């Protein structure tokens, strides 16, 4: 392998979720921030909640002129 062209690999990279959960993994970044993880994702928790859907229906209605009045 060529010298000096490879990224530094961190075996103890910290992943931080918006819910407050942290865990250690391997990565080329020392610290990673994520919005959702297995501790708060609806698939893993079994709870139904909206994830990143704010305004999608409103934008669709506005885009196609389907305003409800």
Curated annotation (Swiss-Prot):
GO CC terms in record: ribonucleoprotein complex; ribosome
GO molecular function: metal ion binding; rRNA binding; structural constituent of ribosome
UniProt remark on cofactor binding: Binds 1 zinc ion per subunit.
Keywords tagged on the record: Metal-binding, Ribonucleoprotein, Ribosomal protein, RNA-binding, rRNA-binding, Zinc
Ligand binding (Zn(2+)): 17, 19, 37, 40
UniProt keyword Ribonucleoprotein present: yes
UniProt superkingdom: Bacteria
Pfam family, any one: Ribosomal_L31
InterPro entries named in the record: Ribosomal_bL28/bL31-like_sf, Ribosomal_bL31, Ribosomal_bL31_A, Ribosomal_bL31_sf
Cofactor: Zn(2+)
GO biological process terms on file: translation
Record-stated family: Belongs to the bacterial ribosomal protein bL31 family. Type A subfamily.
PANTHER family assigned: 50S RIBOSOMAL PROTEIN L31, CHLOROPLASTIC (PTHR33280), LARGE RIBOSOMAL SUBUNIT PROTEIN BL31C (PTHR33280:SF1)
UniProt subunit comment: Part of the 50S ribosomal subunit.
HAMAP family cross-referenced by the UniProt entry: Ribosomal_bL31_1
Function as written in the Swiss-Prot or TrEMBL entry: Binds the 23S rRNA.
Protein's name in the database: Large ribosomal subunit protein bL31
Organism from which the protein derives: Caldicellulosiruptor saccharolyticus (strain ATCC 43494 / DSM 8903 / Tp8T 6331)
